[in-house]
Amino acid sequence: MSATERPRRLYRYVIDHDKGFAPNPFFGVCTLACCKPSIRKYAETGDIVVGFGPKKYKLDGQIIYWMEVDEIIDFSTYWEDPRFRMKRPQMGGSLCLCFGDNIYHRCPDTGEWIQEESFHSDPNSLVGLGNLKRDTGRTEKVLIGREYAYWGGFALAPPERFHCLIKGGIGEQYSVDDEALKEEFIAWLKDLPDRGFVHDPADWSRDPKLKQLFQLERAKC
């Protein structure tokens, strides 16, 4: 089933940690493979996902990214697909590689989940059980979008007429009171000239630990 069989949804939520992990906007494709299990479970191709900035960085109400979902696969396919090898995390590499979101696949012998060392691991490279449960417990779906714009720390403020569509606080939302306004908002997003990875994630220049790492030449993407 695709969103063409129902009105396409406009999923909105606040990105509390904008590190380039969820979503992962690198290498020419935007992926949402971790966090936001409700969106990943129910979204269909053709739906639009919009992430707003966090209040802690004074980015609330501003758009960090948007993407149109054009492909949905499961974790195992994501892990094995050569198109997404660069999305596998490489700790110690550039920040784009450190925050790879292609981290889940099943052990062929036991069927148990393997969580690769990543942002969702616990300290000392241990499996982050809480993250594993949240990421895999409700759905195995990975959302993929090639039509997207990611502004990161240069989040974009929408025009005032769309402020009623802004999502604040925790959770996510797709319901709207005005379908015509929703479609106008989507059209506005698609008319913007920016596409793909536009600017670095907000946390890279604001989180103290990442800010220090970002200054190292080897960390640059």
Language model segments and positions:
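Short N-terminal edge-element motif at the start of the domain
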Residues: 1-61
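Contiguous surface segments at macromolecular interaction interfaces
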Residues: 1-6, 36, 76-221
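Aromatic side chains
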Residues: 11-13, 52, 65, 78, ...
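Short beta-strand-centered aromatic/proline hotspots
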Residues: 48, 61-72
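Short, flexible active-site-adjacent loop segments at beta-strand->alpha-helix junctions, enriched
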Residues: 55, 73, 154
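Eukaryotic short linear interaction motifs
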Residues: 58-59, 74-77
